[in-house]
Each structure stands twice: as structure tokens, then as C-alpha cells.
């Protein structure tokens, strides 16, 4: 989101520029070189699952060696030798690239790669590589909570909010407390929170039998167990807020606050913005009327509410599926199901999209897709009720949604194709007749093939366009590939999908994980565009940052800049730039919904 008063601190994360001053982390100090022949090895810093393909990336300005080795850290013995596979293309100033494939190494332990007179950072190989990361990422979600925030041990925005555009007189009080702050700012969106809530519930449902979710925190996010998996506590935080946004069967509200929020850095409990009812007081709550909205000169292009309604129904129906299993939460489950049914009908009555609202800047969530959401909602309602009309609806909406996606495109509007992959196709697949199963698989395959083509345009096989929030696209691409494999048992995309996972965890030009504080001994974003972290100088674990963008996007956005000199200058390219700098909200701002989607990906990898 658009910032206001950023600070100018910058931290160096990786070995950098051959021309500028270099700054090393302890993690990489052993790799320091200063010659023009310097080479770099990029790995998945979290490590590799024993059975997974394992492909590192290496690059340099000079021709690369032919052979590489894998060395065990403890014994210093070489345990694997292989031939480097040259890859076509360049990145920035680097003209020579290769892949180091050690997939056949199945031994558990801690190792490093040796290649071209350089050693990689240590990495692990283990069957349990991904068992903790989903749970660890919940720390970021708790830190984003609005209302009582356990990370801050403080209450914020208890006055949310007063209505706009609804059937009630403008300025009428509506209890919209709770939920999550969207990113580095303090807005709250049903548009993103519905997706986050549903993906958390799906993560729990898919991982429930694999003992990867812990109970270390209570419902308030305090460090006390409560006989409920922490991921369910977090999902319920989202569900409870969503229920407040649907106070009557015919009403749905969709956004709290707007970009008037961007008025200086403060902790959430120290709110100062005036939305017309006094400094730090009530914030506006927008009603979902399916029409263009905007209380100043910038208007959305809304033409319905089915995108919100479909995701809302999916989250509520998933909540019913999970919470109806326990006698203590069965009544709550039926409340969820009733709300899901009601809002789904609102979506059927007003097909189209309700976009996010802006006020003083042209940036908003400009979603244009909705059949995918209605498909997902209908599929989950059928799973919850067994009522055939929901299945018929899901199939109808699936045909309309088809292959519509950002995949294969060089550009797209901000959150135009949202969610970034269609979970409706996956959730419909197992309950659909055979002919529809084949169709759904073909839809997923179409996007994966297009992304494969995109991946061939860069030496790292990143299969996404580097638009704003590209890391969310990477998460979606990998998730779609793993779900396709679950659906069809077709493993042709597995290596490609794992390269996307590896990209997020360090196998990228900048050599950094894109997840805050993960892995603990690795290189990860430190100077993130997040008010709580910046003010308190206290790191938070588990948040996925927006990720690299086209250089032209970075140069075009309002209020974005970096400290100079750029410590990552050697690794920037016209195709993508990334900065671990608080002033760059386009690449280094963690997002709530991106983190929730990543939790589903981490769950899929843990149970794989």
C-alpha cells in the first residue's frame, strides 16, 4: 500500500555489488569474494525433503565449471558429485547460469554445495523439512489482528465503524471490530480476509490427520493452549469478523477504512486518522451494493458482489465442515452455514465484482473475476449440505471460470485475477462426475503449461509475471501444481513447482527467503514495510513480502524509493527488482492474505 513517512534504514542481506561497497550477513561471510569472476549459488535455505527433486541455481560473469559436489557439513566428506547443467539466458550483469541437480541424494543431514570455487550456505535434507513452517507463519497472522492484538497486547480500532453506501443512513454505527489489518497499513477488507479465512480452514482440513498443527495459543492468541489447533483459532478470528459484516440476511459489508489511513506511522492502538468523526475515532465501513464506490475523486468499477459472496460462502461452509464435528462448536457451525447460504444467494442475485475502495490515491484491489468464487462457494456448500442444486451451480460456474487467470500473461491489474488460483476447481473435482473431472484438470493444466513457458524466459524458471505481489503469484502457481498432482496423480509439473517453492525460500537472484524470520539461520527480509516492526524494532515471523516487480512498476509507483546505494544492485534486472528496504512498499511489504495462502502451500508440502 502507499506509504507516508518511511524511515531510511536499509539492511544488507546478501553478498552484493561488484562495484559498490559490500555488506555481508554472518550467514554469507564465508562466501565473500570481490573479483569480477565471483560466482553465486542459490538454494532453498529451508532445505529439501528427502524425496523431492533438488535443484540449486548458480551464476557468474565468467564461464562456469562443469562439475559440482555436495559436502556433508559434519564430516566434510563429499557425498555427491554431479554435472552442472547450463541454462540459457542472463540476469542483470550475469551472463553465465547453471542448474545443480542433486535430486538423487536421499541422505538426511546438513550439507553445502561446492561449485566454481564457491561454497553455498548450509542446508538440510529431511523428511520433515516443511513440518513447522505453516504453524510458524501464524505468528504473522496474530500480529495482523485488529481489536485485541496479542502480539502488541493492546486493543485497537474498537470504534469500527460507521456505514457508507448501505441501506442504513450514512454514518450509522455498525460493529465491525476484529478481523485482520490487511498489510503494513491498517485497512480491513472482506475481499482478502474471506480468501485468507477459507484457505486457513482448508489448510487445517487437509493437514488435520498429519499432526503438523500445534496448540500453543488460545483463541485470543495468547501463549496458552486451549485444546484447539492454533490455525483453527486464527480461522475463527476471521469467521467471527465476517459474521459481523453480515448483520441481516440481505446485508453484506466489505471494507473498513480506506487510504486516508496512510497518514503517518503509528501503532494500531495509537490511531490518529480522522474519517469525519474525530481523530482516532470511528472508521468508515463500506456496504457491498455492487456499484462503483469512492468517497472522493477515485471510483471503483464494481458491478456486483459475487466475488465477495462466493468466497464468503466458501469460508462459512468450510467452517461448518470443520466445526460441526465437535459437539461444543456444532451450534456455531450452524450459524456459519446459515450465513454462507444467505450470502451465496446475494451473490447469485448480483453477479459481478465488488472491488476495493480508494480515496486519495488511484490504488485499489481491482478484482474483475467472480465465477471462480461462486464455483468455490457452491462446491463447499454442496460438501456441507449434500444439496444437489449447489453441485449444479458449481459445475455451471466452473465452466464460466474455465482457465481465466493471470497465468501466461505479462501484465495484469492489481489483484485483477483474485484469488490468484481457483481453489473451486480443486474442491469441485472430487465430487464431480468423470467428464467434469477431466474438464477441471484441463483448466489447471492450461495455466501450468502457460507458466512453464513463462519460466523459460529466465534462468531461475520463475513462472510468473513480476507484477505487484508477484510472490502471491508464485505461491498460487506452486499450489495449483501440487493440487493438480493430487487430483490426477500426474507428476509432470513437480520439479517446476518445487522451483517456485525454492524461489520463495532463497533460490532467486537476490539469495533471500521471501518470508520474514524464516529460516531462522538464513537470509530473509529484515527492513520490511510494516509499522509495528519498524516502530518497535521487533521482528515478526512468517510474513511473506510482496516480492519483486518489473523495474518499470517500481519506478512508476507513488512514494516508493530506496536508500542508496542499493546493496542488491548487482542482482537487479529490468525484469524484476527487489529491495529489503522499508521505503519500498512495492516489494518488501508483508501481506495478510499472501501469508494465509502461503500457509496452505506449506501445508501441502508438509503432507506431501
Regions found by a protein language model. Give the residues of each.
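Aromatic (Trp/Tyr) and acidic
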Residues: 41, 45-121, 127, 139-198, ...
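C-terminal transactivation domains of fungal Zn(2)-Cys(6)
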Residues: 295-303, 314-365, 429-430
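Acidic, Ser/Thr-rich low-complexity linear motifs
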Residues: 356-367, 408-415, 458-468, 517
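Boundary at the C-terminal end of the N-terminal hydrophobic targeting segment
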Residues: 32-34
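Acidic, glycine-anchored loop motifs typical of Ca2+
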Residues: 219-231
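N-terminal secretory signal peptides that target proteins for export/translocation
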Residues: 1-10
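Carboxylate/His-rich catalytic cores and anion/metal-binding grooves
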Residues: 230-251, 256
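Bacterial N-terminal signal peptides
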Residues: 13-26
